[in-house]
């Protein structure tokens, strides 16, 4: 993987290998949590945060549940729950987040594929020949599709058809994909084929949002001539959002970048123009200008 540059500014981009590799997200998260053992991290699970809001003294932030009880309170809050951030943040904090639904088609893995290592393949999605789910079930998968502006988790048979078409395209040059296509059709006929929908989070310019979040109360004062330096930020409130389909790749890097920003570290892992490109303060200006264009 590498960063690519263009003449105007740095761009977050990844070079994909033709044959990819598989990582279990849950195993990766567990490894990160294990690495934090001995730190001051307190993991709280089984709680639903309904909103993030200033504490009464306005010097801290509170994570509040649906019954208005404070779950946690701290000097710094980081919102990093993808498109669901729209329900945590104030309604008038306009970041221009967009849902991008994607459907994966999957079924029981071919026993032959589980007995030997086969690479993942890419074409308008990824074909993964075999991996274990959290239920210790071994499956294959193909996907996912893209539907910008859609947040519904309901599967659509047309997306299964789209995933089959992508797999069929792979099959024109890959015997492995041809076998997978045969398995796809067999399981579709037997009723073993299944679908799963996830919702990505994207920004207006499709770049991540990483850093100090804008002060919602100051957004009403912005005008067409406002610059990002005119956008006030909410002290202690940060965000890591809009990672799109690259969250697994970008989250570790941008997590380090965000930690440095919170600590006020002047050294950075990214060049200044790239930091500016992912600055959350750009978001309300983009939302305002997009609305102006739509009115014309």
Segments (PLM) and residue ranges:
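Active-site substrate-recognition segment that forms the wall
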Residues: 76, 80-235
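C-terminal catalytic lobe of FAD-dependent flavoproteins
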Residues: 180-296
């Amino acid at each position: 993987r590498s960063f690519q540059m263009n003449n105007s500014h740095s761009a977050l981009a990844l070079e994909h290998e033709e044959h990819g590799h598989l990582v279990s997200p849950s195993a990766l998260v567990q490894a990160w949590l294990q690495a934090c053992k001995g730190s001051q991290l307190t993991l709280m699970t089984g709680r639903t945060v309904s909103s993030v809001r200033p504490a009464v003294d306005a010097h801290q932030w509170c994570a509040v549940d649906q019954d208005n009880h404070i779950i946690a309170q701290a000097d710094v809050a980081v919102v990093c729950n993808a498109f669901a951030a729209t329900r945590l943040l104030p309604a008038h904090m306009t970041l221009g987040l967009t849902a991008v639904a994607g459907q994966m088609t999957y079924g029981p893995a071919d026993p032959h594929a589980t007995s030997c290592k086969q690479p993942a393949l890419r074409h308008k999605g990824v074909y993964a020949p075999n991996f274990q789910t959290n239920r210790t079930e071994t499956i294959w998968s193909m996907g996912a599709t893209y539907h910008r502006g859609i947040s519904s988790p309901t599967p659509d048979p047309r997306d299964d058809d789209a995933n089959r078409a992508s797999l069929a395209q792979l099959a024109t040059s890959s015997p492995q994909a041809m076998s997978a296509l045969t398995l796809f059709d067999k399981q579709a006929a037997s009723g073993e084929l299944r679908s799963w929908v996830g919702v990505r989070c994207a920004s207006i310019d499709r770049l991540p949002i990483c850093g100090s979040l804008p002060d919602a109360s100051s957004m009403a004062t912005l005008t067409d001539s406002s610059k990002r330096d005119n956008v006030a930020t909410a002290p202690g409130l940060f965000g890591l959002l809009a990672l799109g389909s690259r969250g697994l790749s970008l989250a570790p890097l941008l997590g380090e970048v965000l930690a440095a920003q919170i600590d006020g570290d002047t050294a950075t892992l990214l060049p200044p123009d790239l930091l500016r490109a992912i600055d959350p303060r750009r978001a309300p200006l983009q939302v305002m200008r997009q609305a102006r264009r739509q009115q014309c």
